[in-house]
């Protein structure tokens, strides 16, 4: 009998073991769809990004008009740009839901998978930031100025570091060209990190909603979850195309329709919606270095999550107190996102400070505390 090429070919067998014959828990819910959705987001962003890069000019005098040219004169250029800009939003929606799933169901106990995931998140955030600068509108320019300036808070080397990043004494042409270089490079780095992320995941196999060992009841990935994933793709791509076609500027800032002008500061400098929670935490501390440290901590705190797991149960499925705390955290992040979009004035300042404090309190103190309490309740 001839050997099955799918199982014997060096390349095909890797694909087979990852996407076809992969043993998968039989009870994973739609919350497990977001990994593959992130893969589709990445593929879409790389494809649309390549097409945009073919028409883009990374020069301060030409960048803004080259983007306008793409939208006006290139076949379906407007659609490619709108898909790319809104695709970023969907990328972040998926990654935040994916992280939320990981938190709720204790997936972070696969430490290597979790840590590579956080590195992926940081790389994605860097990619989105440098990409936002490229159209060279007002918010692009001032966003770049404000965020890169944060590095000057680093003692002793800060100012040198910022000028080195800028390639001069302010955000200018060298900054734009290097940001374009980085924006082109980083998505491929994300693709590479994704393979590492999956390699670690397939070492242990997927977690499941019950948080129990599911080896005795696993099913092949294909056709069960391949079909389920395709349904997920459709449900992701439908709202993306709807947004890109009907309301492409809904999530953007009108300020970015004005070409960058170093002499005019926009009244409210704010990032895209997916960074607002971190921006609110940054602004809630009246000290520059303190704010920068809080900003970094708001994301890097995720590295500590596996160490703070005190419960005897892996998931929150049967832990109502932890569930309540989890949804409080979600509400808290929603409040932070809202505060980040508001001007720095009363009552937004105090709300932002309280929400920032609550964010760190829930993750660092209350989650381990409630976990320990629930363990005690199990004994009675």
UniProtKB/Swiss-Prot annotation:
It is a multi-pass membrane protein. A ubiquinone binds at residue 202. The chain crosses the membrane at residues 34-54, 78-99, 114-134, 179-199, 227-247, 289-309, 321-341, 348-368. Pfam families: Cytochrom_B_C, Cytochrome_B. The keyword Transport applies. Its main location: mitochondrion. Heme b b566 binds at residues 98, 197. Binds 2 heme b groups non-covalently. One of its GO terms (biological process) is mitochondrial electron transport, ubiquinol to cytochrome c. Keywords: Electron transport, Heme, Iron, Membrane, Metal-binding, Mitochondrion, Mitochondrion inner membrane, Respiratory chain, Transmembrane, Transmembrane helix, Transport, Ubiquinone. GO terms for molecular function: metal ion binding; ubiquinol-cytochrome-c reductase activity. It comes from the Eukaryota. It is found in: Mitochondrion inner membrane. Heme b b562 binds at residues 84, 183. The keyword Transmembrane applies. Its cofactor is heme b. Belongs to the cytochrome b family. The cytochrome bc1 complex contains 11 subunits: 3 respiratory subunits (MT-CYB, CYC1 and UQCRFS1), 2 core proteins (UQCRC1 and UQCRC2) and 6 low-molecular weight proteins (UQCRH/QCR6, UQCRB/QCR7, UQCRQ/QCR8, UQCR10/QCR9, UQCR11/QCR10 and a cleavage product of UQCRFS1). This cytochrome bc1 complex then forms a dimer. Heme 1 (or BL or b562) is low-potential and absorbs at about 562 nm, and heme 2 (or BH or b566) is high-potential and absorbs at about 566 nm. Component of the ubiquinol-cytochrome c reductase complex (complex III or cytochrome b-c1 complex) that is part of the mitochondrial respiratory chain. The b-c1 complex mediates electron transfer from ubiquinol to cytochrome c. Contributes to the generation of a proton gradient across the mitochondrial membrane that is then used for ATP synthesis. This is Cytochrome b.
